[in-house]
């Protein structure tokens, strides 16, 4: 199976998510991204994941690392990967401008110290598993059984799908205050865990991982309107190479010291 995705379709998916989600909240972004991706046929879902990897890799260069350090008080390999997930979710124009010069990130509404979005880089995995789980629940009679036991909680056709999504994306969120809702969550999680499908994307990707020709074909389209990244060394003085972003971060720090801290906020 070859990945089926174009740069226009990839960024149109991102735009639809941005139009619906709270873009300051990764959990909201993950849910709306999942809802979009679970609709895709498997070749396009594979293509979306490959495109995500490609765009994330293209944004891996020293000056972008410096931008991540300014925004998040430092960085590491994993943290920089998560930062680039956030960058992709800012949309095509912001992404392209950041490739031209990461200092252009200063024009965005940046949630400083909160742009390391690990989860959204994995949503394609969850969406694929979600497709398999929906089929499994239906064929195994689980869907009918849960609707019989929890009719008030599963009134709408998509209520169970949302319950499955919540357990995939946030399996450790706080317990429900209503006993019946907590029981539904417990049962859904049990069926997911015992299905053997929670990590089914790993096998799917291994079996359908694109070869070099397919990667090259995909990336020639994905990168067709993007700038070339110049080879450079890690900058020594971030305030000099990224002056706008540096000033914006300094202003944010100053504002935080003037107001009372939020409950639990680090200073």
Summary of predicted features, one role per range:
Residues 256-267:
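Non-Sec secretion/translocation targeting segments of pathogen effectors
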Residues 1-42:
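N-terminal leader/targeting peptides and immediately adjacent processing regions
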Residues 92-97, 101-242, 246:
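Basic, alpha-helical nucleic-acid-binding regions used in initiation and control of genome expression
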Residues 31, 35-116, 166-168, 172, ...:
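Core of folded catalytic or high-affinity ligand/protein-binding domains
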């Amino acid at each position: 199976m070859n990945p089926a995705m174009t740069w226009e379709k990839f960024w149109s998916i991102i735009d639809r998510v941005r139009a619906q989600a709270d873009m300051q909240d990764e959990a909201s972004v993950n849910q709306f991204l999942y809802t979009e991706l679970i609709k895709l046929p498997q070749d396009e879902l594979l293509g979306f994941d490959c495109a995500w990897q490609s765009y994330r890799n293209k944004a891996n260069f020293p000056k972008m690392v410096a931008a991540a350090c300014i925004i998040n008080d430092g960085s590491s390999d994993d943290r920089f990967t998560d930062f680039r997930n956030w960058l992709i979710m800012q949309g095509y124009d912001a992404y392209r401008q950041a490739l031209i010069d990461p200092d252009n990130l200063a024009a965005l509404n940046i949630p400083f110290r909160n742009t390391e979005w690990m989860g959204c880089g994995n949503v394609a995995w969850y969406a694929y598993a979600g497709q398999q789980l929906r089929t499994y629940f239906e064929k195994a009679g689980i869907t009918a059984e849960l609707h019989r036991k929890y009719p008030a909680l599963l009134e709408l056709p998509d209520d169970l799908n949302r319950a499955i999504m919540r357990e995939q994306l946030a399996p450790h969120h706080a317990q429900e205050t209503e006993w019946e809702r907590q029981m539904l969550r417990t049962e859904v999680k049990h069926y997911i865990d015992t299905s053997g499908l929670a990590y089914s994307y790993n096998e799917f990707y291994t079996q359908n991982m694109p070869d070099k020709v397919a990667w090259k074909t995909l990336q020639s389209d994905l990168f067709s309107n993007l700038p070339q990244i110049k080879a450079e060394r890690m900058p020594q003085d971030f305030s000099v190479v990224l002056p706008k972003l540096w000033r914006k971060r300094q202003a944010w720090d100053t504002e935080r010291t003037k107001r009372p801290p939020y409950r639990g906020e680090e200073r």
